Amino acid sequence: MARALIYTCPSPGHAFPPVATALALRDRGHEVTIRTTSASVEAIERLGLSAAPIDPRIEAIPLEDWKARTSIGALRSACETFERRAHHEIPDLQRAIEAERPDLIWVDSNAAGAATAAEASGLPWAHYMPYPHPLPARGVPSFGPGWAPSEGLPSRLRDGGLDAFKKVLFRPFVRDLNSHRAALGLPALGSLDDLPVIAPLLIHFSAEPFEYRREWPRNVRSVGPALWEPEGAEPEWLAAEERPIVLVTASTEFQDDAKLIRCALEAFAGRPYAVVATSAAHDPADFDVPANARVERYLPHRPILGRAAAVISHGGMGTTQKALAAGVPVCAVPFMRDQLEVARRVEQCGGGTLLSPRRLRPDRLRAAVEEAIECRGGAERVRDAFQHAGGAEAAASALESLVAVKRQPTEV
């Protein structure tokens, strides 16, 4: 039996991805503790897992990348936030290690400070990544803008140029992170590209064909999407709803995407669909809701997906992959963060359509959703591939292997 310590960043969409694997580890006889957002602790404890909040000073540093004017500007803003959090994550994880005495540490890939502390601990440790893998590779577009893959020379020059620019742009973040690493006796990073490969193991919550085919880094184990969500009662109105459902989602972390819900409500008002929107960071009372629609802050998506004709997604990895894992096509309207990359993958894998928020209009959104509905076959192919990726059990086995390697006796 081993003790596993899981550490998440404060983003709402990053708290639940490791939960299914934590349950798998527990069911194999291991002790599991999760340090996560204060809002998630109760839901995790109800599962019989040990949980505690991360340092509140970390949660008090919000992502403000939604204010950026470009995708690269948003990435830079996010890195600045990660660096500010790192000052608190390092001692926070060190205290957790002292309290829990783990045999294994599993860290959110967006918690760069916690990862630094995990590496310096000398214990077996791993990353988890709940978004598209950002590392450059041949045939894979430079991460950020959501460009389509292409093997042509112009695209290779474009991608190489942007990758070189990002190395310069993110140099201050790498420099600051290296100061933390030096204080802990760790070697310096050469660039931001070192972060995804520095852990002995990275559990990637995705899989081909949603992900672009590529030569994967040796530390990556792609296990398919993280589908766990808190149990919720099936909405009482769902059983009586006979119309095909269009599910609309907004980001759980504020990014000013309420216009997507407003546009969807207008696009399908009076149409033969039931529109169900989860507003998350937005107040449901702020929307004018037509007779064939409802807006609630949160609803369990799983039972609704079982009845959905399509999902209108903001391009968040969690909602998008839950839809595709259910074989439901997606119309992705990305705003920022990894959403541009997620939305392009929806289009490229044949699981739905992509509509730029700059072109967002009721008639265009309706046309894009109707086109997405015709992509159910592609969504089902992605669903089948996800089911064969191994899921939480594969992730648990990979994590167990780290501890097994550490415990092997040294040959004399």
Locations of the language-model features?
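Nucleotide-activated sugar donor-binding and catalytic core shared by glycosyltransferases
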Residues: 1-10, 16-33, 39-50, 96-99, ...
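Short internal beta-strands
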Residues: 32-37, 275-279
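Conserved nucleotide-sugar donor-interacting segment of glycosyltransferase catalytic cores
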Residues: 83-156, 209
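Conserved nucleotide-sugar phosphate-binding/catalytic loop shared by glycosyltransferases and other
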Residues: 34-78
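Short gly/pro/ser/thr-enriched loop/turn and capping motifs at secondary-structure boundaries
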Residues: 41-42, 58-61, 132-138, 339-340
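Short, charged, surface-exposed secondary-structure boundary motifs
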Residues: 61-67, 135-142, 231-233, 305-307, ...
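A glycine/proline-hinged amphipathic helix-loop "lid/cap" segment
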Residues: 64-65, 75-87, 138-191
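Donor-nucleotide binding loops and adjacent catalytic segments primarily
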Residues: 206-310
